[in-house]
C-alpha cells in the first residue's frame, strides 16, 4: 500500500507551547512511518526563540525540511496536512486537512475559529477543556437573501456552531533514565517551582504577591520563578528581573525567598528541576490553560501540584474517575481583563478563572505543612499511574487514531497494485 504524503505545518523548531505540540504531532506521525511519508513546513511562533540543541531528531527534522522544499518546488502535493497553529491560520492544503490546536484558555472561541474548524476534515485538541469550549460555543445570527419576487431582503435565523469531528488527545510523558537533579543554590529547604511566562494569562504577579504574603515570616520557604517575557536573551532577563524586583519591593521585611530562573533550558533540564530535593511542589495560579505542560511534567515526576482547579490541567491532575490529585485552588469565572483581550483569539466577552487569594494561600500552606510532615509521598505513586496512563506509545496511537486515515479505499494504490497482463 502506498504511504500517504503528510505535510506537518507548525512551529516545530521553536521553544514554545505550540512548538512542543508540533513536535508531539511529528513524533506521532514518525511512530507510523509505515503509513506516512512525512514533510515539514516550519513556522515561527511570535517572538519565541528557536531550539538550540543538536540531536538526532533535530538532524532528521532538518533533512525533512530540505526534502519538503524540493518536493514542493517540483510540484508535489499532499494527501494530508496537519496544521499546528491557531485556527484562524488553518488552510485548505491537502485532500485531508487536520487542524491541531491548543484551543482556548477561556469559556468561548471566536466565530472565525468555528468557521475555520468547520473547513477542516477533523480537528484535534490538547485537552477536553478545549474540546468542550469549541463544542459549546454557539452564535445566533441571520442569513440574508433577496426575495426574487418582492426584491425585499429576507433574514432567516441561523446558528453558527462546530460541526466538524473533534478529538482531545493529551501529551505523553517523557522518560529520562539518567536524570540527575538540577543544581541550584537554594538557601531555603522548601520551595515552590512556578514555570510561567510574564503575561496576563499566567497571573504571575498575583502568584508572587500571594506567596510572599502567606510566607512573609517563614525563612524556610522559597519560590523559584522560571520565566521570560518573550525570549531567553539577556535583555529579556533584565526585564524579568526588573519586574520581579518591583513586586518584592513592596515587602522589604520579608523572610521568604524569591528566586529568578531565566534562559534556555532543555527538556531534560526542565525535568531535572523537579527532581531537585529542595523543590517541594509546583505552583500555578493561572487564569486558564489549554493543557498546562509544566504542571504535567511536575505531576508525572512525582511533585505535588498547587493549581487553579479549572481548564486543561484537570485532564491529568484528576484521575479517570474525576478524583482530584492536587491542591485545588478555588476560583471564580469572570470576564477576562482588558489587557488580556486579543482580537480574534481571547474575546472581550469571554471568561476565565480568577483564583481566590485566600484559597491560594491556604493550599500553598497546606502543601508545605504536608511536605514537612511527610504526607506528600503519595504523589510518587500518582506519578507512576500518570506514566502508565500517558505513555508515549498510548498517546502516539491516540493521535494517529484521531487522524483516522488508515481506513478507506485508496484508488491510486489499488491501480498501482493491479496485475495487468496482455492477452493475445
Give the label of every model feature segment.
Residues 351-359, 369-401:
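A charged, aromatic-enriched C-terminal amphipathic alpha-helix characteristic of glycosyltransferases
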Residues 1-77, 222, 397, 424:
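N-terminal pre-catalytic "stem/leader" segment of glycosyltransferase-like enzymes
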Residues 7, 184-202, 208-211, 223-225:
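Conserved donor-binding/catalytic core segment of Leloir-type glycosyltransferases
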Residues 234-273, 280-281:
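Nucleotide-activated donor-binding/catalytic signature segment of Leloir-type glycosyltransferases, i.e.
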Residues 122-178:
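Donor nucleotide-sugar binding/catalytic pocket of nucleotide-sugar-dependent glycosyltransferases
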Residues 7-9, 48-133:
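Extended catalytic core of nucleotide-activated donor transferases of GT-like folds
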Residues 366, 370, 392-424:
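C-terminal alpha-helical cap of glycosyltransferases
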